[in-house]
Amino acid sequence: MNDNWLKQTVDKPLYDNLLWGRPENKLQAGKVLVIGGNINSFAKTVNSYQLLISAGIGQVTILLPRPIFKVIGQISTDLIFCPSTDSGSFNSQSLDNFIDYTSSADGIFLSGELSNNSETLVVIEKLISRVTKPIILSDDSIDLALHLDDNLLNRNNMIYVGNLDKFQKLFSKLKSTDAITSNISLSDLVRVMQTFSQKNLVSLVTIHNDYVIVASRGQVSTTLIDKPENRDIFKLVHHCVCWIIQNPETKFQALSCSAITYQTI
């Protein structure tokens, strides 16, 4: 029996008190800064705005490389266009924007679609090194982060939401000897994620088969996915962002709640 493996369903959540106590006032529902996109890929980052609002966040600001303005225009005052490289991704001068907007946000969502070039990596590295607020990474922002030093990659304000392929790379980077394969059993995955989260500071969220699995500081929760269409990690990550922004001191409970609300809202 594993006392640190907690199980829930949509009908029987682990943390009713948190689910019923969500802020109803937008002013109390948190502010998130979204950073992502490049001139060749930015739709997911722009679409994050509505998904985060639907998940329950109070305010969203999205930072994009400046050339994207020529494509979409100023469709919202919450879209901010930052200095870019010639190839249309964030450059080193973007750091001032990153830091300025982080100061008024409760956390950062690195949404992905970040060009895998050295200048973008350096500016993201400098941002992460200066920020103690929650940072949620998904999609190819995880791949970019794998180039960081271990002391930046492995911090207690870092939350990774991704598939098992990305987690295997993360485990390898942080010198875990456990292997993750696509056909791993649920019980083995729980064991591996529990061990990893005991030894490391980060929190993890993934979907495997019919379950959302959350791991943080040695605790693991599994949430049964009640419908096939809810195997949607893109929707899930936005609920993770919302819950972490609103409950930064109780990451495990917050992320476990996100596994409920992304299926019901």
Predicted regions and their residues:
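N-terminal low-complexity/intrinsically disordered extensions
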Residues: 3-11, 186-190, 250-264
